[in-house]
């Protein structure tokens, strides 16, 4: 079976740490690269990341370090940083020697900025000729870290790369599907967080479960609309039914463990929404992506009513 011999994960937050734990289930040489020296020592010696994952025990052989000088030696590098940090992260890794010899798996959701584009397209500028794939699925970080059942989609224009990555992370309890439609998977990964805000708002206003289910249907239509702008869904629409699109969408919209759904719910029940928005300091990827998507709607004259409605709550005039 064709596999990567070693795997690096860049990003020591909840999702990055859980992806490192997932990778370590099938690979004996996995290293988590992060900035916080104290958390790195904690993972090394106690096999926990209390700040982000509570007391969940991580695999015994998982390594952690802040020393980026060795990251270039890893065949597969998983990028798990917030969307706003993507460009700076790739530029930093380039100064430490990563090149087209490394395969990059993007686990960051959202859009690259200035200009607004897909992360896979930004990588063509920042790191030309690199092998690139994208990861998405219904994956709450704490459940991944506990090695509970889950699934994901892996997309790459080179389907052999997607298959090779799948060989490293698939198991009886973590299933994967592969696709060459890297566009649709990225668009869905960015938009689902905005739709989750709407789901939380609907929950707060007691719209009922029928409305929340209808939201999923309408959200898929808007994913299709924007995906086609970027050249997605050229061959068929099968990817819409996979873990990385409808699976991730349903989880993000229905789980109060989702930061975006919880943000929408708290906004919905707030008596002073303007004050709430001003004082809310936690990172909400849907909020970050919203302005970028609104610019795309204007640029391409798109009809995406859910996005527009969320904007009326989150970015009131």
From Swiss-Prot:
Signal sequence, renumbered to the chain: none
Listed name of the protein: Glycerol-3-phosphate dehydrogenase [NAD(P)+]
Enzyme class: oxidoreductase
InterPro entries the UniProt entry points to: 6-PGluconate_DH-like_C_sf, 6PGD_dom2, G3P_DH_NAD-dep, G3P_DH_NAD-dep_C, G3P_DH_NAD-dep_N, NAD(P)-bd_dom_sf
List of residues binding sn-glycerol 3-phosphate: 109, 137, 192, 248, 258-260
Source domain of life: Bacteria
Location(s), subcellular: Cytoplasm
């Amino acid at each position: 079976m064709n596999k990567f011999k070693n795997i690096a994960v860049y990003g020591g937050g909840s999702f990055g740490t859980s992806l490192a734990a997932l990778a370590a289930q099938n690979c004996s040489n996995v290293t988590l690269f992060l900035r916080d020296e104290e958390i790195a020592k904690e993972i090394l010696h106690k096999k926990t990341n209390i700040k982000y994952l509570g007391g969940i025990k991580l695999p015994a052989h998982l390594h952690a370090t802040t020393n980026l000088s060795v990251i270039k030696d890893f065949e597969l590098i998983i990028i798990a940083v917030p969307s706003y940090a993507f460009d700076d992260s790739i530029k930093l890794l380039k100064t430490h020697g990563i090149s087209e010899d490394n395969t990059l798996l993007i686990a960051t959701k959202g859009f690259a900025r200035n200009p607004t584009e897909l992360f896979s397209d930004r990588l063509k500028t920042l790191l030309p000729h690199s092998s690139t794939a994208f990861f998405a699925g219904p994956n709450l970080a704490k459940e991944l870290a506990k090695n509970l059942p889950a699934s994901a989609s892996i997309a790459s224009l080179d389907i052999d790369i997607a298959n090779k990555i799948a060989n490293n992370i698939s198991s009886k309890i973590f299933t994967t599907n592969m696709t060459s439609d890297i566009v649709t998977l990225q668009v869905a990964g960015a938009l689902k967080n905005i739709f989750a805000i709407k789901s939380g708002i609907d929950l707060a206003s007691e719209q009922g479960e029928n409305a929340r289910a209808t939201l999923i249907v309408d959200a898929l239509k808007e994913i299709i609309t924007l995906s086609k702008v970027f050249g997605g869904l050229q061959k068929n629409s099968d990817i819409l039914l996979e873990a990385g699109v409808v699976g991730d969408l349903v989880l993000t919209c229905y789980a109060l463990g989702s930061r975006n759904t919880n943000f929408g719910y708290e906004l919905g029940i707030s008596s002073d929404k303007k004050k709430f928005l001003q004082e809310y300091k936690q990172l909400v990827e849907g909020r970050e992506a919203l302005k970028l998507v609104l610019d795309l709607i204007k640029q391409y004259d798109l009809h995406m009513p859910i996005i527009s409605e969320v904007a009326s709550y989150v970015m009131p005039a």
